[in-house]
């Protein structure tokens, strides 16, 4: 699963995964709220 750039810092990878995790949680929260309040 290592990209073409193995010298990439793990901090950037952690920030990217954290950003995608928060985005996924936000989208799920919006979907669930619209489903429950409808």
Curated annotation (Swiss-Prot):
Sorted keywords for this record are: Chloroplast, Membrane, Photosynthesis, Photosystem II, Plastid, Reaction center, Thylakoid, Transmembrane, Transmembrane helix
Is Ribosomal protein among the key words of this record? no
Q: Which Pfam families match?
A: PsbL
Q: Where are the transmembrane segments?
A: 17-37
- Could you name the Gene Ontology cellular component terms for this entry? chloroplast thylakoid membrane; photosystem II reaction center
What biological-process GO terms show up in the record? photosynthesis
Topological category with respect to the lipid bilayer: Single-pass membrane protein
Q: Where in the cell is it found?
A: Plastid, Chloroplast thylakoid membrane
Chief localisation class: plastid
- Homology family: Belongs to the PsbL family.
Subunit comment for this entry? PSII is composed of 1 copy each of membrane proteins PsbA, PsbB, PsbC, PsbD, PsbE, PsbF, PsbH, PsbI, PsbJ, PsbK, PsbL, PsbM, PsbT, PsbX, PsbY, PsbZ, Psb30/Ycf12, at least 3 peripheral proteins of the oxygen-evolving complex and a large number of cofactors. It forms dimeric complexes.
Q: Which HAMAP family match?
A: PSII_PsbL
Q: Name the job this protein performs.
A: One of the components of the core complex of photosystem II (PSII). PSII is a light-driven water:plastoquinone oxidoreductase that uses light energy to abstract electrons from H(2)O, generating O(2) and a proton gradient subsequently used for ATP formation. It consists of a core antenna complex that captures photons, and an electron transfer chain that converts photonic excitation into a charge separation. This subunit is found at the monomer-monomer interface and is required for correct PSII assembly and/or dimerization.
UniProt-recorded name of the protein: Photosystem II reaction center protein L
Task: Read off the lineage from the record.
Answer: Eukaryota, Rhodophyta, Florideophyceae, Rhodymeniophycidae, Gracilariales
